[in-house]
């Protein structure tokens, strides 16, 4: 009961208005009335005023304000690169379109019209889906803050995606690529070899320090990633909790890493840079390396050959293709790549596995 009789004969109203977003404590009021009838009327009046005030606040929230609320929470709860990505998508594709919109009047129709607008600009289905996801998250914030009762993006289907043919290098192609790199470019030989033989993500590789190499167990301790944001080198946790893992390496790869470490120490001595176990493995100057130089060099080293260049991330695909060719199972590959589930591994790489039907048919041939 929200109304109870006190010992002095009066009636107390106990009305709750939810929880304080800062302290987490319940927001409540307990006024007193002379009679039960007055108490019930007071309770109804307080609840009505609360609903009217909440509705007034909802109507006063503009779309730019809603964006600010979403980005503020995103900056606190997300990794820096994700926050920057959301900020970019919203500023480039969303904010101007809904600038003067009354968020209380945005319906499913307005959302699908916006999606149609995006498609007409020539964006790929994947890009449109990403933008729509960001828009939906903005409205999720409105629902969470009780500005809206429901998300107008609900039940808007994602556009179908056409799976592009995955590009990767086979071992003989990778060997040819490595042979194209001059002998004095040991940094690049080492970087691309580590990428091909471990399948690490680029951010994970650039965040590696010498202390992350276990020479006894022949393992790399992968527990961080990195990126450059607004000119600052930012180290973060890996993509998912499953990305924190230990990746086994072969002896030849360890020897290559040790050769590069010696060369790096000599380079640092010449430049007057301190070298230690905290030094980033693929660093070659007084600041950690950026991804773009390793991306550009792939095309540069391939330019005078008939070898088709691949993207930096395709080294990860190449590693998986190598493991599948060697007969490794999904579970092993999932753990090595740091995927959150086997389903992810199958969805991304399942088509690379050999067709078992052909193998079965060949066995039946042998019976006749």
Curated annotation (Swiss-Prot):
Catalytic residues (positions): 201, 239, 313, 316, 339, 349
Residue stretches in coiled coil: none
SUPFAM superfamilies attached to this UniProt entry: DNA breaking-rejoining enzymes
Cysteines paired by S-S bonds: none
InterPro entries per record: CB, DNA_brk_join_enz, Integrase-like_cat_sf, Integrase_catalytic, Integrase_recombinase_N, Integrase_SAM-like_N, Tyrosine_recombinase_XerCD
Sequence intervals crossing the membrane: none
GO molecular function annotations of the record: DNA binding; site-specific recombinase activity
Residues annotated as domain Tyr recombinase: 164-362
UniProt xrefs under Gene3D superfamilies: 1.10.150.130, Intergrase catalytic core
An annotated GO BP: establishment of integrated proviral latency
Domain annotation Core-binding (CB): ranges: 61-143
Domain of life: Bacteria
Keywords tagged on the record: DNA integration, DNA recombination, DNA-binding, Viral genome integration, Virus entry into host cell
Keyword Acetylation: no
Function: Putative integrase that is involved in the insertion of the integrative and conjugative element ICEBs1. Required for the excision of ICEBs1 from the donor cell genome and subsequent integration in the recipient cell genome. Appears not to be transferred through the mating pore. Integration of ICEBs1 involves an attachment site in the chromosome, attB, and a site in the circular form of ICEBs1, attICEBs1.
Protein family according to the UniProt entry: Belongs to the 'phage' integrase family.
Protein name per UniProt: ICEBs1 integrase
């Amino acid at each position: 009961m929200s109304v109870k009789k006190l010992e002095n004969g009066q009636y107390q109203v106990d009305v709750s208005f939810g929880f304080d977003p800062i302290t987490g404590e319940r927001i409540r009021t307990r006024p007193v009335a002379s009679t039960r009838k007055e108490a019930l009327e007071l309770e109804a009046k307080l609840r009505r005023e609360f609903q009217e005030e909440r509705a007034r606040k909802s109507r006063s929230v503009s779309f730019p304000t809603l964006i600010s609320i979403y980005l503020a929470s995103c900056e606190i709860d997300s990794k820096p690169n994700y926050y920057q990505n959301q900020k970019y998508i919203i500023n480039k594709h969303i904010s101007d379109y809904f600038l003067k919109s009354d968020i209380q009047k945005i319906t499913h129709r307005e959302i699908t019209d916006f999606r149609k607008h995006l498609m007409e600009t020539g964006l790929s289905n994947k890009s449109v889906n990403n933008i729509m996801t960001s828009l939906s998250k903005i409205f999720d914030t409105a629902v969470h803050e009780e500005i809206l009762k429901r998300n107008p993006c609900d039940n808007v289907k994602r556009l179908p995606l056409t799976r592009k043919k995955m590009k990767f290098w086979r071992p003989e192609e990778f060997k040819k690529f490595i042979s194209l790199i001059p002998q004095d470019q040991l940094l690049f030989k080492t970087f691309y070899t580590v990428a091909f033989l471990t399948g690490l993500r680029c951010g994970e590789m650039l965040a590696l320090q010498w202390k992350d190499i276990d020479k006894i167990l022949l393992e790399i301790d992968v527990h961080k990633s990195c990126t450059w944001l607004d000119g600052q080198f930012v180290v973060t946790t890996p993509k998912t909790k499953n990305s924190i893992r230990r990746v086994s390496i072969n002896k030849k790869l360890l020897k290559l890493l040790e050769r590069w470490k010696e060369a790096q120490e000599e380079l640092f001595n010449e430049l007057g840079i301190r070298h230690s176990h905290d030094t980033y493995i693929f660093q070659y100057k007084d600041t950690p390396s950026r991804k773009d130089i390793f991306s550009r060099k792939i095309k540069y080293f391939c330019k005078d050959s008939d070898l088709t260049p691949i993207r930096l991330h395709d080294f990860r695909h190449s590693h998986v293709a190598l493991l599948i060719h060697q007969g490794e199972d999904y579970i092993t590959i999932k753990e090595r790549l740091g995927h959150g589930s086997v389903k992810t591994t199958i969805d991304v790489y399942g088509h690379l596995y050999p067709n078992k039907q052909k193998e079965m048919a060949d066995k039946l041939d042998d019976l006749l």
